Design a protein with these regions (language model features):
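Short, solvent-exposed loop/turn and secondary-structure capping segments
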Residues: 43-46, 125-126, 157-161
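Active-site nucleophile loop of the alpha/beta-hydrolase fold
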Residues: 37, 143-154, 194
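Gly/Ala-rich beta-loop-alpha elbow adjacent to hydrolase catalytic centers
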Residues: 113-123
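Active-site catalytic motif of lipid deacylating hydrolases and related acyltransferases
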Residues: 24-109, 188-215, 224
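Fungal secretory targeting signals
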Residues: 1-24, 228
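C-terminal catalytic-base region of ester-bond hydrolases, centering on the histidine
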Residues: 158-228
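Extracellular/periplasmic catalytic domains that process cell-envelope and extracellular macromolecules
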Residues: 25-27, 105-106, 137-142, 179-184
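Conserved hydrolase catalytic core segment
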Residues: 129-139
Length: 228
């Protein structure tokens, strides 16, 4: 029996192509891309999203993750004086490049996007447009869930909004905006009225609290969208 089982195993491996074998061996069922907020150094990786990233990885055994490499700058000298708009444009391009490349390597892996503040904005751009190219085709289809927290693109009335904000962020989407090409059903965007960046509040500390306040809700949403 053992010999027969081993023979069947070797036969199945021989029948599989090299790409299929590589995917079986190295591609997880779930992979997370996360983007940090403005002024947080690249060495800090995920920034404020870290606890949520770790929660998602705990929920899906074997899940992988990586931080988007981009300036996360707002004009300050510590990040090279790169303007906020330039940083967001670079970040958006980095998201599209990283997700597309990963999908080409691991086409069956389900992808989750998580972004905080400017990091949320670049994920927003990659899915919904606004700063260069967006995700398209198979790479877009691989994204099963996206979480934006404190996204300055926030505008009241968008179908994926969560939280108490009834106004808009400092880089708000225009009136009548429609997210495209992504399906809005895969997105949740968290913003509260106290936040001066994604809304019109005056409590900058609240801007850092979304994982604490909504982390469990965001995790539940992700779990409802990912089938692994």
């Amino acid at each position: 029996m053992k010999i027969a089982a081993a023979t069947a195993l070797f036969a199945s491996l021989a029948a599989a192509g090299p790409v299929e074998l590589t995917e079986r061996q190295s591609c997880p069922k779930v992979y997370i891309f996360a983007a940090r907020e403005t002024t947080v150094p690249q060495s800090n990786g995920y920034g404020t999203t870290a606890n949520l990233v770790n929660s998602v990885k705990s929920a899906f055994s074997g899940a992988g993750s990586e931080a988007i490499v981009y300036p996360a700058c707002g004009g300050g000298s510590a990040c090279g004086g790169i303007s906020y708009d330039n940083s967001a444009s670079q970040g958006t391009a980095a998201v599209v490049k990283a997700v597309t490349a990963y999908n080409q390597k691991c086409p069956s892996t389900q992808i989750v996007l998580i972004g905080y503040s400017q990091g949320g904005q670049i994920m927003d751009n990659a899915l919904c447009g606004g700063a260069g190219s967006t995700l398209t085709g198979n790479a877009l289809a691989a994204v099963q869930a996206a979480i934006f927290m404190g996204d300055p693109h926030n505008r009241n009335g968008l179908p994926y909004n969560v939280g108490t904000c009834k106004a808009q962020g400092f880089a708000a989407r225009p009136n009548g905006f429609t997210c495209s090409p992504a399906k809005t059903s895969i997105i949740q965007s968290y913003c509260d009225s106290q936040d001066p960046y994604c809304c019109n509040g005056n409590d900058a500390n609240h801007h850092q609290q979304y994982v604490n306040i909504y982390g469990n809700q965001a995790l539940s949403f992700i779990k409802s969208k990912v089938t692994a």
